Swiss-Prot record:
Residues 107-119 have a biased composition (Basic and acidic residues). This is Small ribosomal subunit protein bS6. GO terms for cellular component: cytosolic small ribosomal subunit. NCBIfam families: S6. Residues 104-127 are annotated as: Disordered. Gene3D superfamilies: 3.30.70.60. CDD domains: bS6. Keywords: Ribonucleoprotein, Ribosomal protein, RNA-binding, rRNA-binding. InterPro entries: Ribosomal_bS6, Ribosomal_bS6_sf, Ribosomal_S6_plastid/chlpt, Transl_elong_EF1B/ribsomal_bS6. The keyword Ribosomal protein applies. The gene is rpsF. GO terms for biological process: translation. It comes from Coxiella burnetii (strain RSA 493 / Nine Mile phase I). One of its GO terms (molecular function) is structural constituent of ribosome.
């Protein structure tokens, strides 16, 4: 089995369907004895350029281990799903399980905001 990294851009109007789509794709992978090593939902983000007059998209990242047959099925599923506006499948040398730089940046931003709020709360209590 080979390792793959998959990035999926979903139309922003279809964001509510993302959990069902993820479940469907995971079941396709697991039916054929594949494994999902990492799944990240990056949420809605601004596109670098518009695609079909859409300026934002809902991003998903998956790292999987599977056969080529599963990849072909996933490509067909992406191609015929109107909610998917772009997809990219890359072959990787090994399984990637740690969080991506985008998620690390988001977590860092959340922690720094929490620290800032806590510091402001302490300052207001002292005053």
């Amino acid at each position: 089995m080979r390792h793959y990294e998959i990035v999926i851009l979903v139309h922003p109007d279809q964001s509510s369907q993302v959990p069902a789509m993820v479940e469907r794709y995971q079941s396709m992978i697991k039916e054929k004895d594949g494994k999902v090593h990492r799944l990240e939902d990056w949420g809605r983000r601004q596109l670098a350029y518009s695609i079909d007059k859409v300026h934002k998209a809902h991003y998903l990242l998956m790292n999987i281990e599977s056969d080529q047959g599963v990849i072909s099925e996933l490509e067909n599923a992406f191609r015929y799903n109107d909610a998917v506006i772009r997809s990219l499948i890359l072959k990787r040398d090994h399984a990637i399980t740690k969080s991506s730089l985008i998620m690390q940046g988001a977590e860092k931003g959340k922690s720094s905001r929490k620290e800032k709020v806590a510091a402001e709360a302490e300052a207001s209590e002292e005053a």
